[in-house]
C-alpha cells in the first residue's frame, strides 16, 4: 500500500490558482481555442449541474469578475493549456482585455448537459470556417475528447485510472494511520509544501478585505469582537481567511486536495497551525498532513468528486480533525473516535456552489475539527446509537455514500434551480 498511498498523494494534492471548476472550464476552452482556425464567432459550453453550481458565483483571480463566462473567455485568450490547473496564473493585461471583449460580444452560450456525470465540461468553438470541441470528464484535467473540423485529434478515457480511483474506497483508516506513522520521512516530506502554499494565502486573507472577511473578523481587535484571542480561534481564523481570499479571486496558488482548493485549505491549514502551536517538528507535521489528506481523499471518494454535500466542511475538516488528533498524541482508536464525531456533527452540510460564503463553512468545519479532536483525545466518541454513526468507522464513512445516493438524489437539482432562478430575477 505504501506506493499506492504515495501515488495517490502526488496525484490528488496539486496546485491550482482559483476555484477548480471555472479553471477546468478555462483549461477546456484553451485547448479548443488552440485547435480552432479563424476568428471565434460563437462559444457553446455544456456543463453538468454540479459544475454550473460550483462555477456560477465564484471570483476569477485577477479579473474582478465572477463565473463561467470570464473563465472561459480567459482560457480562449490565454491559450496555454499546458499549464492545466494553473492556466489562470500570470496572464497579461492584453489577455485579460481580449477576454473581456469576448464576454462583451455576448457570443458565449452556457447550457446544462443532461448527464449522470458529476463533472462534465464540453466547450465548442465556432469560426466562419472551423469548429473545435473539447470534453473533460470525471476529474478536472481528464480530457477525453479533442475534435476539430470533424477530425478526432484525441479520444481517450485512459488518463484517469479507474482502478486507482476505486482503490480509494479500499483505503482503511487503520492502514492510513499506520502509513502516516511509519512512512520514511524523505518519502512524504513533499506534503509540507501544501501547508506552506496554503498558509501564504491565509496570510493574504488576514491582511486584505476579501469576501466576507470571515477570518480577519474573528481575530480583529475591538469592542465588538465576541471571539477570544485563544488558540482555537486563531486556527479557525487562519483557515477561513484562506478561503476568503481564494473565493474572492485572490491571484495566488492553492494546493488542492481531491480536486478542490477549499478541501486543500480545510485539511492542511488547521493541521499546520496546530503543529506550530504545539511546537511540533516538520516530520511530525508531515505525518499529520499525510493522515489528514488521505482521510480527506478516502471520504471524498464516497461523497463523489462533486457532491450535494460540502467536501471541505465534511471530508476536509474530518481529515484535519484526524491530523490534529494525531498531533495531540492520539492513537488509532482516538482517530476512529474523531471521524465518528465529525460525521455525526457535519454530515448534513450542503454544497450550494463555490462562492465567498464557503469561508463560513470552512470556519464551521475547522471549529468542529478542533472540538471533535478534543473529544476524541479524551476518549469520547459518538456511538452506534447516534444517527448514521456505526460502531465500525469504515461503515460510518460508507453511510455518507448511502446518504448521498439514496437521500440526496434531487438536492443538486433543487439547489441549482434556486440559484438559476435567483440569477434570472436579479438581471
Swiss-Prot record:
> MF terms per GO, please?
L-cysteine desulfhydrase activity
Tell me a GO biological process for this protein.
L-cysteine catabolic process to pyruvate
Which source organism?
Clostridium perfringens (strain 13 / Type A)
Q: Which HAMAP family match?
A: UPF0597 (MF_01845)
Q: Which family does it belong to?
A: Belongs to the UPF0597 family.
**What protein does this entry describe?**
UPF0597 protein CPE0806
Coiled coil stretches, renumbered: none
- InterPro entries, per this entry? Ser_deHydtase-like_asu, UPF0597
Amino acid at each position: 500500500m505504501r506506493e499506492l498511498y504515495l501515488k495517490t498523494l502526488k496525484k490528488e494534492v496539486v496546485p491550482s490558482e482559483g476555484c477548480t471548476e471555472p479553471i477546468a472550464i478555462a483549461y477546456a476552452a484553451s485547448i479548443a481555442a488552440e485547435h480552432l482556425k479563424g476568428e471565434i464567432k460563437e462559444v457553446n459550453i455544456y456543463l453538468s449541474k454540479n459544475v454550473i453550481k460550483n462555477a456560477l458565483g465564484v471570483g476569477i483571480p485577477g479579473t474582478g469578475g465572477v463565473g463561467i463566462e470570464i473563465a472561459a473567455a480567459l482560457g480562449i485568450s490565454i491559450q496555454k493549456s499546458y499549464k492545466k490547473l494553473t492556466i489562470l496564473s500570470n496572464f497579461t493585461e492584453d489577455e485579460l482585455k481580449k477576454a473581456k471583449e469576448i464576454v462583451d460580444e455576448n457570443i458565449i452560450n452556457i447550457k446544462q448537459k443532461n448527464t449522470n456525470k458529476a463533472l462534465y465540461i464540453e466547450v465548442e468553438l465556432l469560426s466562419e470556417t472551423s469548429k473545435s470541441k473539447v470534453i473533460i470528464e470525471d476529474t478536472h484535467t481528464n480530457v477525453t475528447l479533442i475534435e476539430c473540423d470533424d477530425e478526432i485529434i484525441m479520444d481517450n478515457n485512459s488518463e484517469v485510472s479507474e482502478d486507482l480511483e476505486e482503490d480509494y474506497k479500499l483505503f482503511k483508516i487503520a492502514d492510513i494511520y499506520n502509513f502516516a506513522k511509519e512512512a520514511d520521512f524523505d518519502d512524504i516530506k513533499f506534503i509540507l509544501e501544501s501547508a506552506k502554499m496554503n498558509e501564504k494565502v491565509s496570510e493574504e486573507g488576514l491582511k486584505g478585505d476579501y469576501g466576507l472577511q470571515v477570518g480577519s473578523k474573528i481575530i480583529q481587535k475591538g469592542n465588538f469582537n465576541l471571539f477570544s484571542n485563544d488558540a482555537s480561534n486563531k486556527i479557525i481564523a487562519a483557515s477561513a481567511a484562506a478561503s476568503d481570499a481564494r473565493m474572492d479571486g485572490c491571484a495566488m496558488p492553492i494546493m488542492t486536495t481531491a480536486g478542490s482548493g477549499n478541501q486543500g485549505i480545510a485539511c492542511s491549514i488547521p493541521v499546520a497551525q496546530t503543529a506550530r502551536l504545539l511546537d511540533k517538528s516538520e516530520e511530525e507535521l508531515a505525518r499529520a498532513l499525510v493522515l489528514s489528506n488521505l482521510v480527506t481523499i478516502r471520504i471524498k471518494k464516497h461523497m463523489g468528486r462533486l457532491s450535494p454535500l460540502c467536501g471541505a466542511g465534511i471530508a476536509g475538516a474530518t481529515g484535519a480533525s484526524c491530523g490534529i488528533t494525531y498531533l495531540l498524541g492520539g492513537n488509532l482508536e482516538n482517530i476512529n473516535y474523531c471521524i465518528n464525531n465529525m460525521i455525526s456533527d457535519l454530515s448534513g452540510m450542503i454544497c450550494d456552489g463555490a462562492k465567498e460564503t464557503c469561508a463560513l463553512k470552512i470556519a464551521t468545519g475547522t471549529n468542529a475539527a478542533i472540538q471533535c479532536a478534543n473529544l476524541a483525545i479524551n476518549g469520547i466518541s459518538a456511538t452506534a446509537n447516534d444517527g448514521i454513526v456505526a460502531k465500525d468507522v469504515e461503515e460510518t464513512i460508507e453511510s455518507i455514500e448511502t446518504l448521498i445516493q439514496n437521500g440526496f438524489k434531487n438536492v443538486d437539482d433543487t439547489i441549482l434551480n434556486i440559484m438559476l432562478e435567483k440569477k434570472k430575477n436579479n438581471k
